[in-house]
Amino acid sequence: MSVITDIHAREVLDSRGNPTVEAEVYTELGGFGRAIVPSGASTGEHEAVELRDGDKSRFGGQGVLTAVENVNGEIAKAVIGLDVTDQRLIDQTMIDLDGTPNKGRLGANAILSVSLASARAAADELGLPLYEYLGGPNAHVLPTPMMNVINGGKHADNNVDIQEFMIMPVGAKSLHEAVRMGAETFHTLKGLLQERGESTAVGDEGGFAPNLKNNEEPFEILVEAIQRAGYKPGQDIAIAFDCAASEFYNKDTKKYVTVADGREYTAEEWTSLIEDLVDKYPVISVEDPLDENDWEGWKTFTERLGDKVQIVGDDLFVTNTSYLEKGIKMGVANSILIKLNQIGTLTETFEAIEMAKEAGYTAVVSHRSGETEDTTIADLVVATNAGQIKTGSMSRTDRIAKYNQLMRIEEALGSTAQYKGIHSFYNLHKQF
C-alpha cells in the first residue's frame, strides 16, 4: 500500500478561456497524477454543482478560487494518508465530506479534480497506462467516435437550433482508420461550405458553425460531404445529432421554440419531425431530443424510435444512477451519455456505465464544450469498453488531444485492440 502524501490544486483555463480546477496528487512511493476538470455550456439542471466564485471583479464571476481552496484545505486534509489505489474509498471520503446530494458545498469540480488525479497517481506509481489501471487486462475496445462537425445551439453563434451534427465512422476497421475517415470528411465539408458561401468559423467543439436556412439543411450537407469524401452514407459513415432540446423548450407554453424556422412545436410534433429526419437520412443516434423533465414525452419518443435509432440521455440522466434507474424502469431512452463532471467522481461514473450495460443500454463517454488538454476520457472509454466516445471535431487541440491519445492506446494494445464500429450499437435494428 502506498498512501497519498500531498495534494495541490490551482486555477487554470479551459478551451473557452474560463477558469477551471487542476489538481495534483503525490504518493509516498513517487507516484504523481495531474488532472484538469472540464465545464459545460448547455448543462442539465440536475448536474452536480460546479462551484464558481461569483466575484464579478475576476473572470466575470467565473473564478474557481473557492473550489481550489477546498481542495488545498478540507479535501487534502481528508484524503492525505489514504491508499492511492483505493479509488472507491477516496471518492466516498470526499462525497461524505461534502455532505450534500449534488456536491454543492465543496464543488463537483473540486472533488472530481482529486478523484481523477488520484487515479493517475496510482497508475503512475504502478507503471501502468491509465486505461489498463482502470480497466485491467480486459480493456481492449476502441470507441466508435461521434465527431461534431457542424455546431449549433449554445455551441455556436448561428441560427441552427440543434446543437450538434456528428459523423460516426461505423464502417471503419480501426480507430486509426476512423480518425482518417472523419478528418477527410471534415475537410471535404469545409470545402463544400466555402463553395456555398457559408462561414467556416468553428464553434466551441471544433465544428463549423454556418448560418443555414433550417434544421434539416445540415443533414443534406453532411450526406453530400460524406459522398464527396468517397464514403457511403450510413454504411461507412453514419450521422448522429444532439438536439439539446431543453435549451429551446419553453416551460410555460410547453413548446419547442425554434429560431431556424420560427416555429413552435408540441412534444408530439417535434417527435414527428425528428422521426422524419431519422427515416430520411442515415441517422444512427439522437441525443436529448426532448426536454430533460418531459419523462412522458421521452417514453413516447422511445416507443416510436427506440428500435431503429440510439436515443441518448444526457441532460435527462446527468450520469446519475438515480435518474438512469428511473429511465430504465420507464423504458426511456436506450443509451446514456457519460460526463465525468456531471456526477463528480470516477467511482460514480463507473457505476453509471455498469448500470447502463446491465440494462442493455449503450454508454457514450463524452467531453464537455469547455475542454482542456486533459485526456482522461480517452483512457476511461477504453478502460470500460464502453464502445463510443463523443469528443468533438477534427480541429482544436483540446479535441484532437483525445483522438491522439486513443490512437496511442490502439497502437499500444496491438493485435488485442478491437474497433467495433457499427457493432457498438448492439441494441438497434435499423438497416441502412
Swiss-Prot record:
Record-annotated active site: E205 (proton donor), K339 (proton acceptor)
Enzyme Commission number(s) from the entry: 4.2.1.11
Pathway named in the protein's UniProt entry: Carbohydrate degradation; glycolysis; pyruvate from D-glyceraldehyde 3-phosphate: step 4/5
Top EC class for this record: lyase
Localization terms from the record: Cytoplasm; Secreted; Cell surface
PROSITE patterns (UniProt xref): ENOLASE
Gene3D superfamilies: Enolase-like C-terminal domain, Enolase-like, N-terminal domain
Subunit relationships: Homodimer. Probably forms octamers.
Protein name: Enolase 2
Organism this protein belongs to: Lactobacillus gasseri (strain ATCC 33323 / DSM 20243 / BCRC 14619 / CIP 102991 / JCM 1131 / KCTC 3163 / NCIMB 11718 / NCTC 13722 / AM63)
Lineage: Bacteria, Bacillati, Bacillota, Bacilli, Lactobacillales
